[in-house]
């Protein structure tokens, strides 16, 4: 009968291996595993597999998929369902006005960290030349974003992790900034190259004992070295401030990212090292996130 045939047709459509059905199955799996942005993540990963933008995915949802695309997509979805950050699965993360390459050797750039870029550009909007040091440069997102906007600024980035620097250099080449920046593998204590108008840093600032309470996708996949701020969360901040007080020019500025509850401790450390506090800037969630200070 016609109704049976119609039922059969509709059943067939469920098993058609097209974009929409694969995304729906992925959505169900991610939801089951408590992934908040299940739909968006499914679309982003499909875009990544097909090398098309999300608009294409949505407009061509009935397009059939090749077996290879399906297996690659399902593999990514399985990894996402176990909490692996989406940026590590696609190898990319949007930050400020650009896309940065990332992998598990670098922290995933956060929207909160864009505050540093925004504030630097605001403070120095009339400045044509400037030397910048980025301590713990990671993917390069802060330093490279600033220098892309201010073509006559020169930058130096240091990181203790060679693999982070490799990723940073990759981003530098991608953004065609090779002649504007230099990188050194060094820990903060032993670095003694140059004097700077401006130092920026997003150091590890999470209390070691609290690391285990972070969201599982952060603690399981992101580099611990980029998160662990010692027993009081301030050990790397102290080192950055110490070193900055040596390497910064008189009246030079330090832009420092901090944890939401570290404002008073950080202010004291800065004042003890001869810094004047210009302002503390809040992030989108209204938490204290960035301290701007001047070496006097």
Model-assigned labels for residue ranges:
Residues 114-213:
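Conserved SAM/SAH cofactor-binding pocket of Class I
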Residues 231-294:
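Conserved Class I SAM-dependent methyltransferase catalytic core
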Residues 48-123:
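Conserved AdoMet
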Residues 45, 83, 113, 142, ...:
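Residue-level signal for inorganic ion chemistry
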Residues 1-16:
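N-terminal amphipathic/basic-hydrophobic helices that include classical n-h-c signal peptides
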Residues 30, 124, 172, 244, ...:
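Conserved hydrophobic residues forming the short capping helix/wall of the S-adenosyl-L-methionine
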């Amino acid at each position: 009968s016609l109704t049976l045939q119609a039922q059969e047709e509709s059943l067939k459509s469920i098993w058609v291996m097209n974009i929409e059905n694969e995304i729906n199955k992925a959505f169900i799996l991610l939801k089951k595993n408590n992934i908040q942005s299940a739909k968006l993540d499914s679309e982003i990963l499909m875009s990544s597999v097909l090398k098309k933008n999300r608009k294409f995915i949505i407009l061509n949802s009935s397009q059939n998929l090749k077996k290879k695309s399906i297996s690659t997509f399902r593999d990514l979805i399985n990894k996402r369902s176990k909490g692996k950050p989406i940026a590590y699965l696609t190898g990319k993360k949007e930050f400020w006005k650009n896309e940065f390459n990332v992998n598990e050797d670098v922290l995933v750039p956060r929207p909160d960290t864009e505050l540093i870029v925004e504030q630097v550009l605001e403070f120095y909007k009339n400045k044509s030349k400037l030397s910048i040091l980025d301590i713990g440069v990671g993917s390069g997102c802060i330093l490279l974003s600033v220098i892309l906007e201010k073509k006559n600024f020169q930058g130096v980035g240091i990181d203790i992790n060679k693999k982070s620097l490799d990723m940073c250099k990759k981003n530098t080449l991608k953004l065609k900034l090779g002649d504007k920046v230099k990188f050194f593998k060094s820990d903060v204590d032993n670095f003694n190259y140059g004097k700077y108008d401006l130092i920026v840093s997003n150091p590890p600032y999470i209390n070691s004992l609290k690391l285990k309470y972070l969201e599982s996708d952060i603690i399981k996949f992101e580099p611990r070295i980029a998160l662990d701020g010692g027993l009081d969360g301030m050990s790397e901040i102290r080192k950055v401030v110490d070193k900055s007080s040596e390497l910064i020019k008189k009246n030079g500025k330090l832009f420092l990212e901090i944890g939401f509850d570290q404002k008073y401790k950080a202010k004291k450390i800065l004042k003890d090292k001869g810094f004047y506090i210009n302002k503390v800037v809040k992030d989108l969630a209204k938490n204290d996130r960035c301290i701007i200070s001047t070496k006097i």
